[in-house]
């Protein structure tokens, strides 16, 4: 059962995330359809009318969400940390940009110069908030909310990792394996023969025959006769067949266990949707809290690991492991084709993400990344 502080923390985080997503949606619409300028509903776009109607409907919905979020978060602004305050500033920018137009008189009055600079007024307001008798309680409440957010995030991370893992292992050991072993003799498709298992069995049988002859030569005994050798090979062949039949069911067991783990993961996500929103805000704060050099280092590490010049060996090991896990033959042609195409597609998507998103959110990180890569 959640405490009052945790529930309040979840509410604030949920409101902030909804407003932030709405503000990002408006920014995306501005960039894609209005040339990175404010959206003008009366402007006719060079798109079908149905698409423009959908764009305007999304825009009005997102603006309303931003306004509601702004009004809900504004009284608790002192409880926000630096990352959350950055999100709130984006929401405030959107709200001010699309505020309802006032009359000409009020507009002329609003354009009148302020008697004092806004920076000085902001400093006075900051000092006033610090001298406010309730400022200490507000700071403590903000600290508690961030602490609750961290605890909730760590809890949901552990649940997302441990629950599927435990369900997979326990279902495979206590439910799936006994059921498959019991049904396999009567259902041949559960233990269908696999070419790679047959090849391994033939190779083991050949090695077994060579070992018998080698042991006889080492001990100085006579080489077993053809009949004795035939009997030993028949016994060994039956053992290898039983082992191959058991191994052939491993793929079915792995698939069923993975499905059970996937269902458990989806169940955890469904019943903890509010906690997942808190986790998203926590991860955003952790990522955006990194310095530009740390962000660039993480990006270079990720790209070199998955799309770098030395990544084919890692992809080959990964694909072979996946094929063995699901009982598929590790086809060399498919692996080479995958390595030749997928990292290129991944690198293209990553460069597009840098161009479209990271260049707007953190241009200094992009500049640092280019400097660390040695590009001009």
From Swiss-Prot:
Regions that span the bilayer: 150-170, 251-271, 299-319, 334-354
Keywords: Cell inner membrane, Cell membrane, Hydrogen ion transport, Ion transport, Membrane, Transmembrane, Transmembrane helix, Transport
Cited Pfam families: CemA
InterPro entries per UniProt: CemA
GO molecular function: proton transmembrane transporter activity
GO cellular component, one term: plasma membrane
Protein topology in the membrane: Multi-pass membrane protein
Subcellular location: Cell inner membrane
HAMAP family found in the cross-reference section: CemA_PxcA (MF_01308)
Similarity-based family: Belongs to the CemA family.
Functional description taken from the UniProt entry: Required for H(+) efflux immediately after light irradiation to form a rapid H(+) concentration gradient across the thylakoid membranes. Together with PxcL, contributes to transient H(+) uptake following dark to light transition.
Protein name in UniProt: Proton extrusion protein PxcA
Species for this entry: Prochlorococcus marinus (strain MIT 9303)
């Amino acid at each position: 059962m959640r405490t009052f502080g945790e529930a309040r923390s979840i509410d604030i985080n949920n409101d902030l995330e909804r407003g932030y997503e709405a503000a990002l949606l408006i920014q995306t619409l501005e960039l894609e359809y209005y040339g990175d300028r404010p959206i003008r509903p009366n402007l006719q776009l060079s798109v079908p009318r149905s698409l423009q109607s959908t764009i305007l409907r999304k825009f009005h919905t997102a603006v309303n969400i931003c306004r509601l979020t702004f009004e809900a978060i504004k009284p608790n602004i002192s409880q926000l940390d630096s990352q959350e305050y950055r999100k709130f500033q984006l929401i405030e920018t959107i709200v001010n940009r699309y505020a309802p137009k006032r009359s000409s008189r009020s507009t002329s009055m609003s354009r009148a110069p302020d008697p004092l600079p806004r920076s000085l007024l902001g400093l006075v307001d900051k000092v006033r908030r610090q001298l406010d008798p309730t400022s200490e309680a507000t700071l403590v409440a903000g600290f508690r909310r961030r602490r609750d957010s961290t605890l909730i995030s760590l809890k949901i991370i552990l649940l997302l990792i441990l629950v599927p893992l435990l369900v997979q292992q326990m279902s495979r050991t206590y439910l799936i394996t006994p059921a498959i072993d019991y049904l396999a003799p009567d259902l041949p498709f559960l233990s269908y023969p696999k070419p790679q298992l047959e090849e391994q069995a033939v190779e083991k049988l050949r090695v077994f025959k060579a070992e018998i002859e080698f042991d006889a030569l080492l001990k100085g005994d006579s080489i077993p006769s053809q009949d004795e050798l035939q009997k030993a090979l028949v016994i060994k062949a039956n053992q290898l067949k039983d082992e191959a039949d058991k191994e052939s069911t491993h793929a079915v067991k792995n698939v069923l266990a993975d499905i059970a783990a996937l269902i458990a993961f989806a169940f955890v996500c469904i019943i903890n949707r509010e906690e997942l929103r808190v986790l998203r805000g926590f991860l955003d704060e952790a990522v955006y809290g990194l310095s530009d050099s740390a962000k660039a280092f993480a990006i270079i590490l990720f790209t070199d690991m998955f799309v770098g010049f030395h990544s084919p060996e890692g992809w080959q090991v990964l694909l072979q492991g996946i094929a063995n896990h699901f009982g598929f033959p590790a086809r060399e042609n498919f692996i080479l084709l995958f390595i030749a195409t997928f990292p290129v597609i991944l690198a293209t998507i990553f460069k597009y993400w840098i161009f479209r998103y990271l260049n707007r959110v953190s241009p200094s990180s992009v500049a640092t990344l280019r400097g660390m890569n040695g590009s001009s």
